[in-house]
Amino acid sequence: MAETDSKAPAKAKPAALRKGALVKVNRSAYNDSLEAAASDPTAPDYIFEGPGELLLVKGDYGQVRWNRPVPDVWLRMDQLESCG
């Protein structure tokens, strides 16, 4: 008889976000970050509600465009999550 592995299977890693993905900002990841400290004391609600479009990914950062008349922003990829 073959022994069975009693370890629980590892959780699947979430799919990486790609250019064109609809995203929103994860509030808990953003609140104590360097990006939050460099911005207004209160972040606008629309970044947490989404959707924003991921325009470009460079290294650990992604450029997000919101469907509002505001400038595009660069945020760390670990602060973004899918709006789906």
Curated annotation (Swiss-Prot):
- Cite the GO molecular-function annotations of the record: oxidoreductase activity, acting on NAD(P)H, quinone or similar compound as acceptor; quinone binding
Q: How does it sit in the membrane?
A: Peripheral membrane protein
Annotated TM spans: none
One term under GO cellular component:
plasma membrane-derived thylakoid membrane
The lineage's top-level taxon is Bacteria
Q: Does the keyword tRNA processing apply?
A: no
**Cellular localisation:** Cellular thylakoid membrane
Main localization category: membrane
Give the first-level EC class, as a single word.
translocase
Please give the catalytic activity noted in the UniProt record. Answer: a plastoquinone + NADH + (n+1) H(+)(in) = a plastoquinol + NAD(+) + n H(+)(out); a plastoquinone + NADPH + (n+1) H(+)(in) = a plastoquinol + NADP(+) + n H(+)(out)
Q: What are the entry keywords?
A: Membrane, NAD, NADP, Plastoquinone, Quinone, Thylakoid, Translocase, Transport
Instruction: Tell me which InterPro entries the record gives.
Output: NdhO
Work out whether the entry's keyword set contains Thylakoid. Answer: yes
Q: What is its EC number?
A: 7.1.1.-
What function does this protein fulfil? NDH-1 shuttles electrons from an unknown electron donor, via FMN and iron-sulfur (Fe-S) centers, to quinones in the respiratory and/or the photosynthetic chain. The immediate electron acceptor for the enzyme in this species is believed to be plastoquinone. Couples the redox reaction to proton translocation, and thus conserves the redox energy in a proton gradient. Cyanobacterial NDH-1 also plays a role in inorganic carbon-concentration.
The UniProt entry's sequence similarity note says: Belongs to the complex I NdhO subunit family.
What this protein is called in its record is NAD(P)H-quinone oxidoreductase subunit O
Q: Which organism is it from?
A: Parasynechococcus marenigrum (strain WH8102)
The major lineage groups are: Bacteria, Bacillati, Cyanobacteriota, Cyanophyceae, Synechococcales
**Gene encoding this chain?**
ndhO
